[in-house]
């Protein structure tokens, strides 16, 4: 079984969000192929972990060249998940499924294909975030999304543990682990945040490379990114 952390979002307590984190993933091509084949058993948002920052959760108590993930922080991921669920519940979704909607909402542009290239699993992904939303369509046209009671922490844990060839990483209550492999430069590029050169010396090195400096940089980026995602919605 895989470690799965279940988060509850404000106002949408009926829709628990199940999240798993893996490192040293050895079968990304297989997982991606199942998504492309629309295998219902693999209905997840499989995200390359290089695009999330490690900041913790305050308000709810294409892989990088060096194989580092693109979710900036747990707040980055879960805020986007909140917007995704809200879009589905208010019939404002732009894509066909809850999980494709989540990937779409993470991206700053309106191209779903580009969203998957930037945030989705690729053939070279080694650090993986899997998100499972407990939603099912009431009809073929997906006019209404209902809670799927068969999706539980245990069911997600069992399935992911059997299909993902990698090391399951336990996620704490605050979810800081979700951003531990983020690629800051990749995230800056995707969200067009500049290169952060104001904080670097002549050789491109950070003037202050300590943890507080890095966390402060991530926090500033997070504010801009969340604003971008909110405006898109």
Curated annotation (Swiss-Prot):
Keywords: Activator, Chromosome, Nucleus, Telomere, Transcription, Transcription regulation, tRNA processing. The keyword Transcription applies. InterPro entries: CGI121/TPRKB (IPR013926), CGI121/TPRKB_sf (IPR036504). It is found in: Nucleus; Chromosome, Telomere. Gene3D superfamilies: CGI121/TPRKB (3.30.2380.10). GO terms for biological process: tRNA threonylcarbamoyladenosine modification. Belongs to the CGI121/TPRKB family. This is EKC/KEOPS complex subunit CGI121. It comes from Phaeosphaeria nodorum (strain SN15 / ATCC MYA-4574 / FGSC 10173).
